[in-house]
Design a protein with these regions (language model features):
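Conserved SGNH/GDSL esterase-like catalytic core that processes O-acyl groups on lipids
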Residues: 1-100
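Solvent-exposed, polar/charged alpha-helical surfaces in well-ordered, non-transmembrane soluble domains
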Residues: 4, 45-48, 52, 96, ...
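Short, solvent-exposed loop/turn and secondary-structure capping segments
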Residues: 43-44, 78-83, 129-132, 194-195, ...
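Short coil-to-beta-strand
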Residues: 61-75, 119, 134-144, 180-184
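Substrate-gating cap/lid alpha-helix
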Residues: 97-99, 103, 128-183, 210, ...
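A short helix->loop->beta-strand "cap" motif at the edges of active sites that frequently abuts
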Residues: 112-116
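Short, well-ordered beta-to-alpha junction loops that form the rim of enzyme active sites
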Residues: 121-124, 185-187
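Histidine-centered active-site loop/cap adjacent to the catalytic His
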Residues: 201-233
Length: 233
């Protein structure tokens, strides 16, 4: 979408990952260093990779940079109920753990002048429990990929998502400067589109029901772009 307005933009992805959890860089990713299936505790490392790659670009200091960041779904779905203190993400899904990781991300990104960072609020995967007549793939995906959320604790997990958002707004206010902008946009609020029979519409979801398909990705991108037009510096 942005390239339609400025064909000189560089760094955008032109392909897809081969594997859901692949962390191997592929040239088609461009400057997209996001890792599918990642938790917030991996965000600082992704930020390091991105900053290093951007600083290899010609005239990187004088060019404006737009960076979008989306985390939280996996933290709410899996990490938020982890009780094993030896787990790699134990404690990171708390509001304070979330803030610490996102603070680290912004600290690294803020080393680059002329940068706009757009955080999308975390979406609420628990709404998938309301899907009418879900396929067996959807039921399995929820059981395996989102085991922390049940109908009984949905209000608690929704509050956790809201706490994440509050921490992002606090960090955004702290890091904004004359040449470094940070904004939090509700591009994922209200997901998912409803089906005629009620509940989330599976036609907007990937086969595993835990990820977006092209239609829903397009919807989110449009919403993020609309909100981003009002970014403040």
């Amino acid at each position: 979408m942005l390239a339609q307005y400025n064909p000189d933009i560089v760094g955008g992805s032109t392909g897809t990952n081969n594997l859901l959890f692949s962390q191997d860089y592929q040239a088609s990713q461009g400057l997209n260093y996001a890792v599918s299936g990642a938790w917030a505790n991996t965000a600082p490392h992704q930020a390091d990779q991105l900053v290093s790659a951007i600083k290899q670009e010609a005239d990187w200091e004088s060019k404006w940079k737009l960076i979008t960041v989306q985390f939280g779904g996996n933290d709410i779905c899996v990490a938020s109920c982890e009780i094993n203190p030896f787990s790699e993400y134990y404690g990171d899904a708390t509001p304070s753990g979330w803030r610490s990781n996102m603070d680290s991300v912004l600290s690294k990104l803020s080393t680059m002048p002329r940068t706009l960072v757009v955080f999308t609020e975390s979406y609420m995967p628990g709404k998938l429990h309301d899907m009418v007549n879900p396929s067996w793939k959807c039921r399995l995906a929820l059981f395996v990929g989102c085991s922390c959320i049940t109908r009984e604790n949905l209000a608690e997990k929704t509050q956790l998502r809201d706490d994440y958002t509050a921490e992002l707004h606090s960090l955004a206010a702290h890091y904004r400067s004359s040449d470094f902008g940070v904004e939090v946009v509700p591009a994922l609020t209200g997901l998912y589109p409803n089906a005629p029979a009620g509940g989330p519409d599976a036609s907007y979801l990937a086969p595993d029901c835990g990820h977006f398909n092209v239609k829903l990705h397009s919807m989110v991108i449009i919403l993020a772009f609309q909100y981003s037009r009002w970014i403040r510096l």
